[in-house]
């Protein structure tokens, strides 16, 4: 009996010693743990104008490693240069005209989502050589230089004209140009001219074209109609696949973007230095233009109301303006 007890105790002691031995080979790390600490890189796209002016602090913070995410960014003169990159998965977030966001949503069958409204109205009618333009009705019989065919500028102008009994292409002609700088050069050469320009290019034109005046604020004209919608110039969209995979990173981006927009509005002198640094416009121009750029970061329910009302107005005017159908609820990203 004593022998049996001794053998049992010896066996227990041996098992205990084996359990306490540290294995020489470390335990494998699960793939999820290995990548959990890796920062998400958000690839951004913006335009040379108010959309990127609101993001310059975010760009600068990213360059200095201060953002909540890692960011890369591309700034272009036209949305047409960047929308293919978003669709092809080369960009994750892009600033585009509001109606283009709806078109992309329809064309990709829900492949993009709306994150925020980034700028409200930044469009103005400017006139050189007279004071003949006093209201929308006074545009009758005139030819206007403009950019933005097939986007917010064209549809905003079409809608405002229609509300005053005028038809674009019949009562009012437009010569569409690819970039605002072309229009500024044309107006400098002519004695009398009318154009529709966005900020900050209105300020650029005023610095280069003698006798140029701001005749109409298109946002004020829109608001005067009291139709329940707002003139939303640009918005931020993201690939739905990215939003589904990285909702927390997207929410962090919106926090960084809101802070960047606030910085531009609250510290214009400092922000304009960054606007020039990132090649958008010169600081002196940006300083005058910023207060008229209506930089915002409207998200959630407020975004849905503001952008949805604007898109409905465009849809009622011309269904093709929003891609043939009003976007459904899935279009609006309501947060992580």
Predicted regions and their residues:
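Solvent-exposed, polar/charged alpha-helical surfaces in well-ordered, non-transmembrane soluble domains
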Residues: 53-61, 80, 84, 88, ...
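Short, glycine-/small- and polar/acidic-enriched structural segments
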Residues: 25-167, 174-176, 193, 199, ...
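C-terminal motif of bacterial Sec signal peptides marking the signal peptidase cleavage site
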Residues: 16-19
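Conserved C-terminal helix/tail region of periplasmic/extracytoplasmic solute-binding proteins
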Residues: 308-336
């Amino acid at each position: 009996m004593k022998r049996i007890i001794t053998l049992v105790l010896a066996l227990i002691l041996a098992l205990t010693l084996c359990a306490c031995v540290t294995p020489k080979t470390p335990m494998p790390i699960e793939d999820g743990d290995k990548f959990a600490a890796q920062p998400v890189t958000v690839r951004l796209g913006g335009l040379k104008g108010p959309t990127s002016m609101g993001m310059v602090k975010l760009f600068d913070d990213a360059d200095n490693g201060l953002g909540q995410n890692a960011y890369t960014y591309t700034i272009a003169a036209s949305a047409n240069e960047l929308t293919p990159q978003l669709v092809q998965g080369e960009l994750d977030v892009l600033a585009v005209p509001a109606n283009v966001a709806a078109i992309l949503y329809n064309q990709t069958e829900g492949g993009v989502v709306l994150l925020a409204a980034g700028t409200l109205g930044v469009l103005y009618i400017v006139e050189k050589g007279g004071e003949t333009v006093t209201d929308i009705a006074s545009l009758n019989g005139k030819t206007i230089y403009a950019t933005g065919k097939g986007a917010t500028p064209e549809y905003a102008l079409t809608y405002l004209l229609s509300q005053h009994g005028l038809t674009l292409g019949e009562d009012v002609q437009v010569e569409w140009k690819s970039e605002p700088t072309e229009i500024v050069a044309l107006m400098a050469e002519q004695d009398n001219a009318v154009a529709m320009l966005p900020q900050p290019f209105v300020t650029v034109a005023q610095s280069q074209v003698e006798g140029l005046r701001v005749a109409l604020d298109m946002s004020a004209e829109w608001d005067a109609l009291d139709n329940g919608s707002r003139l939303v110039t640009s918005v931020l969209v993201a690939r739905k696949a990215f939003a589904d995979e990285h909702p927390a990173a997207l929410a962090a981006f919106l926090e960084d973007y809101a802070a960047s927009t606030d910085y531009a509005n609250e510290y214009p002198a400092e922000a304009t230095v960054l606007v020039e640094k990132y090649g958008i416009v010169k600081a002196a121009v940006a300083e005058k233009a910023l207060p008229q750029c209506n930089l915002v970061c409207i998200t959630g329910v407020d975004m849905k109301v503001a952008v949805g009302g604007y898109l409905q107005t465009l849809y009622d005017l011309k269904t093709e303006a929003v891609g043939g159908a009003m976007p459904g609820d899935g279009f609006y990203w309501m947060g992580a």
